[in-house]
UniProtKB/Swiss-Prot annotation:
Presence of keyword Plastid: no
Main location: cytoplasm
Organism in which the protein naturally occurs: Glycine max
Subcellular location: Cytoplasm, Cytoskeleton
InterPro entries assigned: Actin, Actin_CS, ATPase_NBD
Its job: Actins are highly conserved proteins that are involved in various types of cell motility and are ubiquitously expressed in all eukaryotic cells. Essential component of cell cytoskeleton; plays an important role in cytoplasmic streaming, cell shape determination, cell division, organelle movement and extension growth.
Top-rank lineage group of the source organism: Eukaryota
Keywords recorded for this protein, A-Z: ATP-binding, Cytoplasm, Cytoskeleton, Hydrolase, Nucleotide-binding
EC primary class: hydrolase
Biological classification of the source: Eukaryota, Viridiplantae, Streptophyta, Embryophyta, Tracheophyta
Pfam families on file: Actin
UniProt-recorded Gene Ontology molecular function terms: ATP binding; hydrolase activity
Protein name: Actin-3
PANTHER family (alphabetical): ACTIN (PTHR11937)
Length: 376
């Protein structure tokens, strides 16, 4: 690694909805853009206009009228490697403008997906010729960012949610649980319940508008039934929202009905436990001796935990499930939207971490399987 000392490592958190990327040592990612690759629907329509064969991120978003948009990451797992390569290329050369020496790369991935980690190592070393790389589990990085090494992380993004118990820096794989319910489902649900008010949002462009509404206005009610009563009898929960075309719409109970499905997936015909129960089940799969440490360090992470009121509700629900004398603490760091990336930035900057990198030499010697030996 001596030759790469002079250039800061890159930290890249590949999310279903957004890619967060930047340099180790920074306190926030420099590039945050949608994980989208768009290809022209009709080739030749834009000849002579400098048309590219593919667009990534914000540019794909702004030209979506003439493109077919694809999300290469589904439910946190890469499903299209060619497109993923385009996203990384865009990240390194257009967003972060990495020139001359190739930097070492710390890539953050979802838990429980071994194949992906091998593939990403292969692309990093063989296509991008990085001198060194490391693959870290997203939730573990969020825990580091909160200043802990033991705790349970509920990481909920756009495509998938996970509960990951971590003891002294190591994730406990047998107790990790995955819930295929996250931000995109919440946006879809809000689109659906807005139709009851007569507001129709159907296209992918309109979905972005609803996502924006969700992020600005939705909140989690501490007592759902009581909140519904309040909403029926007064207009205190009503808020107006201006659409891009200037039209103003009003939403009320939808504001807390939308994130309710995180706690009650059955509302959208989904047979799964809510985030509180999934967290509890994860804790119960751990050794009885460490449960107290987990209950006392429940850390929220990811964009879909940004709702106002979610920590209080989570605390209330888990207190109801846990043994009565147990001390429950739910931590919702203000920067949790980016805590995976921040944890990666911290980790890649540590002097003690420098011997953890997988070097190009080690990769050439043992192939992609080295990822499992060194990273997990």
């Amino acid at each position: 690694m001596a030759d790469a000392e002079d250039i800061e490592p890159l930290v890249c958190d590949n999310g279903t909805g957004m890619v967060k990327a930047g340099f180790a040592g920074d306190d926030a990612p420099r590039a945050v853009f949608p994980s989208i690759v768009g290809r022209p629907r009709h080739t030749g329509v834009m000849v002579g206009m400098g048309q590219k064969d593919x667009y990534v991120g914000d540019e794909a978003q702004s030209k979506r009228g003439i493109l077919t948009l694809k999300y290469p990451i589904e439910h946190g797992i890469v499903s299209n490697w060619d497109d993923m390569e385009k996203i990384w290329h865009h990240t390194f050369y257009n967003e972060l403008r990495v020139v001359s020496e190739e930097p070492x790369v710390l890539s953050x991935e979802a838990p429980l997906n071994p194949k992906v980690n091998r593939e990403s190592a292969q692309i990093m070393f063989e296509t991008f010729n990085v001198p060194a790389m490391y693959v870290a589990i997203q939730a573990v990085l969020s825990l580091y960012a909160s200043g802990r090494t033991t705790g349970i992380v509920l990481d909920s993004g756009d495509g998938v949610s996970h509960t990951v118990p971590i003891y002294e820096g190591d994730a406990l794989p047998h107790a990790i649980l995955r819930l295929d319910l996250a931000g995109r489902d919440l946006t879809d649900h809000l689109m659906k319940i807005l139709t009851e008010r007569g507001y129709m949002f159907t296209t992918s462009a309109e979905r972005e508008i609803v996502r924006d509404m969700k992020e600005k206005l939705a909140y989690v009610a501490l007592d759902y039934e009581q909140e519904l009563e309040t909403a029926k009898s007064s207009s205190s929960v009503e808020k107006s929202h201006e659409l891009p075309d200037g039209q103003v719409i009003t939403i009320g109970a939808e504001r807390f009905r939308c994130p309710k499905i995180l706690f009650q997936p059955s509302m959208i015909e989904m047979e799964a436990a809510g985030i509180h129960e999934t967290t509890y089940n994860s804790i119960m799969k751990c050794d009885v001796d460490i449960r107290k440490d987990l209950y006392g360090n429940i850390v929220l992470s990811g964009g879909s935990t940004m709702f106002l009121g979610i920590a209080d509700r989570m605390s209330k629900e888990i207190t109801a499930l846990a043994p009565s004398s147990m001390k429950i603490k739910v931590v919702a760091p203000p920067e949790r939207k980016y805590s995976v990336w921040i944890g990666g930035s911290i980790l890649a900057s540590l002097s003690t971490f420098q011997q953890m990198w997988i070097s190009k030499g080690e990769y050439d010697e043992s192939g992609p399987s080295i990822v499992h030996r060194k990273c997990f």
